[in-house]
């Protein structure tokens, strides 16, 4: 839970957290050696001392990583990952704004993903 005393410019946005969650699972399956690096990035993101610039760099790094790996799994695979544990279920049921991109910067927010899986 984000405390109200942390300025919004220093908060990790929900879309970054969701993308990080998915990337850890992908790396676990594809590149185990990358997990410690991603965990360090997450720890930096959770730190109360990072600046707006660091936040932008983090978002860029995570977006690049996800774009590189996105062909490796299908929508149904993402659905299975999100349904496997409590955190995934929370994220699956969490409804970010329609502008929050889950799969790529051009679209695919979590609401559309849910609709495509349930169709």
UniProtKB/Swiss-Prot annotation:
Domain of life: Eukaryota
Name used for this protein in its record: Putative uncharacterized protein YJL215C
Organism: Saccharomyces cerevisiae (strain ATCC 204508 / S288c)
Organism classification: Eukaryota, Fungi, Dikarya, Ascomycota, Saccharomycotina
